Amino acid sequence: MHDKILILDFGSQVTQLIARRVREAHVYCEIHPNDVSDAFVREFAPKAVILSGSHASTYEDHQLRAPQAVWDLGVPVLGICYGMQTMAVQLGGKVEWSDHREFGYAEMRAHGHTRLLDGIDDFKTAEGHGMLKVWMSHGDKVAELPPGFTLMASTPSCPIAGMADEARGYYAVQFHPEVTHTVKGRQIIERFVLQIAGAKPDWIMKNHIEEAVAKIREQVGDEEVILGLSGGVDSSVAAALIHRAIGDQLTCVFVDHGLLRLNEGKMVLDMFEGRLHAKVVHVDASEQFLGHLAGVTDPEQKRKIIGREFVEVFQAEAQKLSKAKWLAQGTIYPDVVESGGTKTKKATTIKSHHNVGGLPETLGLKLLEPLRDLFKDEVRELGVALGLPPEMVYRHPFPGPGLGVRILGEVKREYAELLRRADAIFIEELRGTTATAQDAAAGLCGEADVGKSWYDLTSQAFAVFLPVKSVGVMGDGRTYDYVTSLRAVQTTDFMTAHWAHLPYALLGRASNRIINEVRGINRVVYDISGKPPATIEWE
């Protein structure tokens, strides 16, 4: 049995990042709404509790409180932002509106050598005070400490930026240690979880396989399962895990909608039919998909058509597999969060995800989602532990609608052929080019990155087809051909992203190869937009 950390969600958009930081410390955790019952908290039996941030105001919304059982359990509690404020109010302190609201970077002074912050700082002042570079996002502030608490941290505009009652193991910070902008945030969360709470760091994917296999066997029994295999990381790892558990009780359905990457179908079939000896039904439905996409230019409409046609094709195949009782999906935790479908139901919906909600209930199948509570990095670790090749497991994310949302405007077979070849060349150049000491000296990467491929140094990279033509010259003749844009970003969480500063030589080679090898494209541009304001995908 794993030690568990209970994260109570008060509605913050970054609550899932708290969970990710805890998991990175190899400790299991779950997110649940702040209004769970006292009985639930006691039955959960956490080693510690973390209270999240919120968009709400502590003194205006009196419904957003932690259950009384949190304070009765006798376990350590960490309050973050709003979590600090509700801790203060519930334990006898005072919170009020701040005249100086803080949103963004701040330098915070640590006080009192508490167990949480002792020895953790980014720099020291001339007087020897430890300072932390943190990320703030609050309009209220704790004005009066609860009985038994001492000051733990402060900023010029927030005199009580942290507080602690070490006798009871209660700690609270006004900043957000879960976001990457707080430089020592991960260290602070690890300190709380591992040292203060004393949780065992035994949440390791290699060990998780045995538990997951046992759970799948218990759920499924001797019934059969079907899974839509896309070639992406999530569905591939889900397929490998389920196949490990139940073997030939699993049938994978691989639908080729004509919008896959170059040679993707062959790679998937070679892996699952050839190496894993799994049952795979291969359906070439490219004519059907491209036919329904003809004349459609709106991005959301394209997504809906691709989703609808996939359901139709998959449903037809599922009906042929009459013994199947389960539908398996590669849904992972961020999918659930982004669709506003967390266990808390408090996060605002960001976008509709193609996995969440799944296929229509008319299939009459039970849902099997063995990766639902895992983050992407955990899924990748699991995939490697299951024996999938790293080049498959560590591929960059690929949208469910495939190249359909990387072709701007109407989708045509001609456009898809041009794009997949251009994209393959760009990815090949990224994989084949390693960062050099000169790149590090120029600030394109860190010194520790020297020797790594630029594919591994980017989080997502791809080509985009622009349905416009430009004039060019090749040989002695004039050309009038299409334009493609290259896109590469670096990010830790995909919620924000920076465009990747790739070496000019790499971009030059990719451009020259695309123009020379892909007949029909005569101009290549590079997208230098961050997220925000742009999104990572163009559509």
UniProtKB/Swiss-Prot annotation:
The keyword ATP-binding applies. Pfam families: GATase (PF00117), GMP_synt_C (PF00958), NAD_synthase (PF02540). It comes from the Bacteria. Pathway: Purine metabolism; GMP biosynthesis; GMP from XMP (L-Gln route): step 1/1. ATP binds at residues 230-236. Its EC number is 6.3.5.2. GO terms for cellular component: cytosol. InterPro entries: Class_I_gatase-like, GATASE, GMP_synth_C, GMP_synth_GATase, GMP_synthase, GMPS_ATP_PPase_dom, NAD/GMP_synthase, Rossmann-like_a/b/a_fold. It catalyses: XMP + L-glutamine + ATP + H2O = GMP + L-glutamate + AMP + diphosphate + 2 H(+). Residues 4-202 form the Glutamine amidotransferase type-1 domain. Residues 203-395 form the GMPS ATP-PPase domain. GO terms for molecular function: ATP binding; GMP synthase activity. The keyword tRNA processing does not apply. Keywords: ATP-binding, Glutamine amidotransferase, GMP biosynthesis, Ligase, Nucleotide-binding, Purine biosynthesis. The active site is at 81 (nucleophile), 176, 178. Catalyzes the synthesis of GMP from XMP. NCBIfam families: guaA_Cterm, guaA_Nterm, PRK00074.1. Homodimer. This is GMP synthase [glutamine-hydrolyzing]. The lineage of its organism: Bacteria, Pseudomonadati, Pseudomonadota, Betaproteobacteria, Burkholderiales.
